[in-house]
């Protein structure tokens, strides 16, 4: 199972003071050295963390691959066509949210998403859709031509009781099986950390987990390379 390291919150810390540090590009290179299989960045409409310059620099220096998260807007579509990342993940986005709060409603806007997927695919990118583990959304993702999906694990991460955790984990298990059964590459992420990742990493059929906030938080105490290496070891062991 692959580990995609999201470096958005390295940029969050930088933007909090408007400084040039910490540098998310350095974090990305350190993550690669520590075993990351790819680097994920989300260029938001409000530019609250990652900036265009970060994406341009990362495209030039990464040894692995970039997973570029973006909202379905003309501005982002044009930027993605210019940058041409290896992977593009379409996500829902509102200015008021602290972080992405739910999956993209593909079923409710199939024509719009289909047009975006087709346009972005012409850049050579593998396009994925960030969706809830819901059969209706998974089927819609296949219909619009996306080769990959990323299942939103936030409800699992936020579950408080053992019963809720088990229910949300089962929802992910079923979503993965349904997606794989429909010929899709299935990734997952959101809210995963060192104490809840193993159960998800043990699910057969998941191609990649994308993790960011927990890594950046842990790196404050152990360093970025150590934080990434520790997470990678947990995922590899659980997915055997």
Swiss-Prot record:
<feature type="binding site">
    <location>
        <position position="17"/>
    </location>
    <ligand>
        <name>3-amino-2-oxopropyl phosphate</name>
    </ligand>
</feature>
<feature type="site" description="Transition state stabilizer">
    <location>
        <position position="150"/>
    </location>
</feature>
<comment type="subunit">
    <text>Homooctamer; tetramer of dimers.</text>
</comment>
<comment type="pathway">
    <text>Cofactor biosynthesis; pyridoxine 5'-phosphate biosynthesis; pyridoxine 5'-phosphate from D-erythrose 4-phosphate: step 5/5.</text>
</comment>
<feature type="binding site">
    <location>
        <position position="191"/>
    </location>
    <ligand>
        <name>3-amino-2-oxopropyl phosphate</name>
    </ligand>
</feature>
<protein>
    <recommendedName>
        <fullName>Pyridoxine 5'-phosphate synthase</fullName>
        <ecNumber>2.6.99.2</ecNumber>
    </recommendedName>
</protein>
<dbReference type="GO" id="GO:0008615">
    <property type="term" value="P:pyridoxine biosynthetic process"/>
</dbReference>
<comment type="similarity">
    <text>Belongs to the PNP synthase family.</text>
</comment>
<feature type="binding site">
    <location>
        <position position="49"/>
    </location>
    <ligand>
        <name>1-deoxy-D-xylulose 5-phosphate</name>
    </ligand>
</feature>
<feature type="active site" description="Proton acceptor">
    <location>
        <position position="42"/>
    </location>
</feature>
<keyword id="KW-0963">Cytoplasm</keyword>
<feature type="binding site">
    <location>
        <begin position="8"/>
        <end position="9"/>
    </location>
    <ligand>
        <name>1-deoxy-D-xylulose 5-phosphate</name>
    </ligand>
</feature>
<feature type="active site" description="Proton donor">
    <location>
        <position position="190"/>
    </location>
</feature>
<dbReference type="InterPro" id="IPR013785">
    <property type="entry name" value="Aldolase_TIM"/>
</dbReference>
<dbReference type="InterPro" id="IPR036130">
    <property type="entry name" value="Pyridoxine-5'_phos_synth"/>
</dbReference>
<keyword id="KW-0664">Pyridoxine biosynthesis</keyword>
<comment type="function">
    <text>Catalyzes the complicated ring closure reaction between the two acyclic compounds 1-deoxy-D-xylulose-5-phosphate (DXP) and 3-amino-2-oxopropyl phosphate (1-amino-acetone-3-phosphate or AAP) to form pyridoxine 5'-phosphate (PNP) and inorganic phosphate.</text>
</comment>
<feature type="binding site">
    <location>
        <begin position="212"/>
        <end position="213"/>
    </location>
    <ligand>
        <name>3-amino-2-oxopropyl phosphate</name>
    </ligand>
</feature>
<feature type="active site" description="Proton acceptor">
    <location>
        <position position="69"/>
    </location>
</feature>
<dbReference type="GO" id="GO:0005829">
    <property type="term" value="C:cytosol"/>
</dbReference>
<feature type="binding site">
    <location>
        <position position="99"/>
    </location>
    <ligand>
        <name>1-deoxy-D-xylulose 5-phosphate</name>
    </ligand>
</feature>
<dbReference type="Pfam" id="PF03740">
    <property type="entry name" value="PdxJ"/>
</dbReference>
<keyword id="KW-0808">Transferase</keyword>
<dbReference type="InterPro" id="IPR004569">
    <property type="entry name" value="PyrdxlP_synth_PdxJ"/>
</dbReference>
<feature type="binding site">
    <location>
        <position position="44"/>
    </location>
    <ligand>
        <name>1-deoxy-D-xylulose 5-phosphate</name>
    </ligand>
</feature>
<feature type="binding site">
    <location>
        <position position="6"/>
    </location>
    <ligand>
        <name>3-amino-2-oxopropyl phosphate</name>
    </ligand>
</feature>
<dbReference type="GO" id="GO:0033856">
    <property type="term" value="F:pyridoxine 5'-phosphate synthase activity"/>
</dbReference>
